[in-house]
Amino acid sequence: MRIHLIAIGGSAMHNIALALKQKGFKITGSDDAIFSPSKDRLAKHNLLPVKMGWFPSKITSDIDAIILGMHATVDNPELKKAQSLDIPVYS
């Protein structure tokens, strides 16, 4: 199962990403800014986004679910793309 976390850098969100990866899920994520210790922990587990920002091109039909962090707004371009593809969104 592939899961994308929008606003992966939050204190709760990065822990969710790490736990899901440990359970065997394929995890991707994005954020406009990530600070330590979240940044360091995501990097250690190869989950730190290469580039900061929101990229609708990251949202593809092979994603099974989106987890939306509190930092993301309703007009987030990745969220809008996920909704257009009918990908389930959890927050």
Predicted regions and their residues:
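N-terminal leader/targeting and accessory segments in enzymes
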Residues: 1-91
